[in-house]
Amino acid sequence: MSASHSSASRSQTIHRVEVRPGPGCVDVRGSSLLKRVVADGGAGARAINHAQVYFLSGDLNQVDLDFISRQLLADPVTQVAFAGASAVPNPGCTIEIHPLAGVTDPAAESVELAVEKLIGKVVRVQTGERWDFHGASVSEGLGVSAKYLANTVVQAVHAAPYMPTQFPAGAARVVEVKEIPLLKLNDDELEKLSRQAHLFLDLQEMRAIQAYYRGLSREPREIELETLAQTWSEHCVHKTLKSRVSYREKSLVMGSPSLLARAGKISGHSLGEVGEMVVDNLLKHTVAAATHSLMDATKPGSIDWCLSVFVDNAGVIAFDDTHALCMKVETHNHPSAIEPYGGAATGIGGCIRDVMGTGLAAKPIACTDVFCVAPPDVTVPKGCLPPARVLRQVVAGVRDYGNRMGIPTVNGGVWFDPRYVGNPLVYCGVVGLLPRELVRGVVRSGDRIIVLGGKTGRDGIHGATFSSTELTDSHADEFGHAVQIGNPVTQKKTLDAILAARDAGNKPLFHAITDCGAGGFSSAVGEMAKDIGAVVNLERAPLKYQGLTPTEVWISEAQERMVLSVAVANIAALQKLCDDHGVTLCDLGEFGTPNKELILLWNDLEMGRLSMDFLDGGLPNPVREAVWDGDWHARYAPVTAPSQKRSGGMLETLCALLAHANIGSKAWIIRQYDHEVQGTSVIKPLVGKFGAPGDAAVLQPLAHSTRGVSIANGLATGLAADPYIMTLVP
């Protein structure tokens, strides 16, 4: 059985336009790069110039091209536009950096829309950057590019002005129902399949899948295996935190704390056969148990302001009698280790979408971020990016996404430690506000599966399963496709349309909403349909380009997509709102099936069929071993710092302290963030006459109320290497 994609390839006329600073205007990008190169001891270039490059393909005459160049692409006050490629400096070289095929190009998307609005013509656009190194050789220019500018995971580097002959276009391809031989595999072969197919499921999980399909007397289809891998990934299900843990202790010294006494006295903590303590579901019986205990109305002093915990995309607490606050925080470490800008941008973008997908859509009102990276002078292992570049780019990623969406970034922190050299900590957070009566949504059988926002591409495939594996020096090559590049403008328009649909009439136009993050449609639709099933028509998904397989469409983690459960009667009204806001709407199928199944179709060809009971409840819960080693604790848990004693007076000592990376000012980061947008910040990140860092930021989210929200954070990795010991430090 097969079907075909349509072809989208044709000849094109491509125009190149360069935009650079005008006469008498400072080249900020070029001079900034030159300062960094000189400060790091680089040599070669006497001057560096920067230009933005645009490629436009379409039915454009010279008048059109001149108008677009001068009125849209270039600022007539500070910039000049040049058609074609300007001369390479002599002596010197030119290095150009362009997005790889299939990588999201947000600036190009905005230009395409603007051209259509301005002159009524549809064009295709690609962008790039040109760097002219005066007095430098090509090898020196490429060296600067590799160190400061380009990431070959998502970008192509050219040692001369680049001119494409045509834009990439998807090719026609046959769609087949691909089966994966699994039923007869032994354990070694199951583990090999899991790794080679990038499923990253362990042996017990692969055995569970094998048993399920043996019960069906058929081999699994590719799209079914991928669905299980996404749904059962560490990122999506937090299986390590939810696992059963067998805990024992050894080599305890006098005075060391012991947890074994808890066995049998606390819910979920039982005594094992050989004296160990078994915790059944670590998350449920520790972190969640503490919260639910505080909420227990039968206990004195219980709290009543936790409105929704551990069930939605973000936890929800009461703000006042009519409104609630939610907050979502998330690490985006693995992607940021490979592509820091995209990793951080999609980290904060994902938290924004989680807040949008909480209850019946919360409005994001603030962003936070914490970055932990290695010191700039640390030795960088093979396959890792320089820490200074990682920090600059993760800051830029959060800055660009939050600022362009109009959400203030009001709080954060930075910490330097050599242990972050291989995998930085990129910890993003978003606070949202929503009416209390909209804290919960419920998917209804018969509702349409509606997708709003961005189009689907190959970016982000296997991002969820990638989070379940260990980073090595080959991951930049092997998992470049797992990195997503977001478009905050698309997400801003989507947010506006969703809030308009939420506030339309007496009740929202949708019954439930979630974001399309890790695992793409597979996780979003699978999560919403877990109790009732769904039928999905994958061929309906709007694509960035043709040629994607049904499996790629299903698991793509392309950004800025939200999934809604919408009654048929509300589709027309929702479509009207989306048209008003310039947002794409797609009807992907229907929630609810007679046998509670997930059915995946492509032009009526069944690509996959899974029981929701197995997809949602079939994940094995293994016993993980945990050992408290007193000897290890004595040797490694205490954190020591080398002596910083030095001769000299108090002023010299003070200057040395202020020069330390963990003490010095972070204003260069804070000042890049817009903390005034939305007009709610009462106490800013920097306070006082001299702009010192404040203890917390305070927001006034409702104009008619003086009730405020205080946001702060703490980081204390210097207390101990063992997190439990850290809680005991007075």
Task: Say what each PLM segment does.
Residues R10-P23, H50-F55, N90-A101, E129-W131, ...:
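Short glycine-/aliphatic-rich beta-strand segments at the starts of folded cytosolic domains
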Residues E18-R29, L60, E96-A107, G135-V138, ...:
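Short, surface-exposed ligand-recognition loops at beta-strand->loop->(often short) alpha-helix junctions
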Residues G24-G42, D66-S69, V103-I119, G526-A541:
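Short amphipathic alpha-helix segments
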Residues V37-A43, S69-Q79, V115-K121, G143-A156, ...:
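A common structural junction motif
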Residues D40, R46-H50, E112, K117-H134:
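Interaction-mediating elements
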Residues G58-V63, G135-L142, S565-A572:
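Helix N-cap motif at beta-to-alpha junctions
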Residues T78-R124:
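Short, solvent-exposed interaction modules
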Residues G102-T104, V122, R130-D132, K147, ...:
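Glycine/proline-enriched, intrinsically flexible loops and inter-domain linkers
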